[in-house]
Amino acid sequence: MARVTVEDAVNQIGNRFDMILVAARRARQIAVQGKDPMVEEENDKPTVIALREIELGLVTADTLDADERQTVREREAAEIAAVAAIAEGRNAI
């Protein structure tokens, strides 16, 4: 079982409340969205991995925000391309 002290993570983020929000967002990315961990997994749960990433300075609220904005842009571009393909198909008929 991994033991993680959160003091380093708190120091990286600024306060424990924001650290919890950042860790939860990152753990959700790893567990649900299938994002790859930036540290060795070592059979740890996503929450522990998220805390280790925060401790090392690999994850901040800003990096998570930027990643989410990029994901939204990619999703919107895919939707626009799909609509354009459908419209072209209708025009060809």
UniProtKB/Swiss-Prot annotation:
Pfam families: RNA_pol_Rpb6
Top enzyme class: transferase
EC assignment: 2.7.7.6
Cellular component terms (Gene Ontology): DNA-directed RNA polymerase complex
Catalysed transformations (reactions): RNA(n) + a ribonucleoside 5'-triphosphate = RNA(n+1) + diphosphate
Keyword set, alphabetical order: DNA-directed RNA polymerase, Nucleotidyltransferase, Transcription, Transferase
Known function: Promotes RNA polymerase assembly. Latches the N- and C-terminal regions of the beta' subunit thereby facilitating its interaction with the beta and alpha subunits.
UniProt protein name: DNA-directed RNA polymerase subunit omega
Lineage of the organism: Bacteria, Pseudomonadati, Pseudomonadota, Gammaproteobacteria, Alteromonadales
